[in-house]
Design a protein with these regions (language model features):
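Preference for extracellular/luminal or secreted protein segments
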Residues: 141, 161-264
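A substrate-binding/cap region within the structured catalytic cores of diverse enzymes
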Residues: 1-13, 18-44, 48, 52, ...
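Surface-exposed helix-capping loop/turn segments at secondary-structure junctions
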Residues: 13-16, 59-61, 198, 222
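Second-shell residues forming the walls of enzyme active-site clefts
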Residues: 42-203
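Generic helix-packing signal
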Residues: 5, 9, 52, 56-58, ...
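Flexible hinge/switch segments at interdomain interfaces of large molecular machines
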Residues: 20-26, 67-72, 111, 221-228
Length: 264
């Protein structure tokens, strides 16, 4: 985490949409799999905390994803809306466990995924990223998260067809919405929602103040050094970073000796 933060800061990047805090218990998961730290909730949580603390100690905001948990799904939310049918007890012990630990640790950011979780949101048409029950009720109120809340990309098929998408994401409690095909239309949508009383101006201002606070903490007012392209490859690919690359030997696999096919 610290090494990633060092490189990010040199490149002028202050937010990393990582780590993946999903517990990947489904071997058929088409989108998380190797992005996850594994299938054990406690081990995933340990690695999420270590990586996130490394990032934030280096001045880069960590963003744990995909709340409330995308690990046990067989649908890619880029292409559809995955459903988690588990009860609350199971969700608390597996999917939500790493997120609770990162909240307790006081880490900075969470990304909410596009999922349908009946145990948390009874409306089958409302994705977790657009659910006030999930974003505000669970993440903020119950779990006590006070950091920045981001949606996953709103151009993903899990939610992209929802009308008034940006407004619904903000009403759910998200602070920032990611990736709009037409930013100007999204801004106009929010302005109209405020004028019509659908979205509170006070709530929008509170989100803006929160975002500006994090920008300040991440160095908004500090002079931005000019990007030094010369020698960057050597500064990024340090000897220490190379030393972290480990060659693994799989002793369970037996190799077959070659035979002389000419004699067959």
């Amino acid at each position: 985490g610290r090494e990633v933060a060092r490189v990010f800061r040199e490149l002028g990047v202050h937010v990393n949409f990582a780590p993946d805090a999903d517990v990947n218990t489904n071997p058929l998961n088409p989108v998380i799999h190797v992005r996850s730290f594994g299938e054990d909730p406690k081990k995933v949580a340990e690695k999420v905390l270590a990586y996130s603390r490394g990032l934030e100690s280096g001045g880069v905001l960590s963003v744990s994803k995909h709340f409330p948990g995308h690990g046990d799904t067989d649908v890619d939310s880029h292409k559809g809306l995955p459903v988690l049918y588990y009860n609350r007890e199971r969700l608390d012990s597996v999917e939500l466990y790493p997120f609770r630990e990162m909240v307790r640790a006081g880490l900075g950011g969470v990304m909410v995924g596009h999922l349908q979780v009946p145990a948390l949101e009874p409306d089958a048409k409302t994705a977790s990223s657009l659910s006030r029950n999930v974003v505000t009720g669970l993440l903020k109120d119950e779990m006590g998260f006070q950091g920045l809340v981001f949606t996953d990309a709103l151009d993903m098929k899990g939610v992209s067809s929802v009308p008034q998408l940006t407004t619904k994401a903000l009403l759910a409690g998200n602070d920032m919405v990611l990736v709009q095909y037409n930013t100007a239309n999204a801004v106009q949508e929010v302005l109209s929602a405020v004028k019509e009383g659908v979205l509170s101006e006070k709530e929008v201002e509170a989100k803006c103040r929160k975002i500006l606070t994090y920008k300040y903490l991440l160095g908004l007012r500090q002079p931005r050094p000019q990007l030094q392209v010369s020698g960057m490859s050597y500064r990024i690919h340090t000897d220490e970073a190379k030393a972290l690359v480990t060659s693994l030997e799989n002793t369970d696999v037996k190799t077959l000796s070659l035979i002389d096919i000419a004699t067959i």
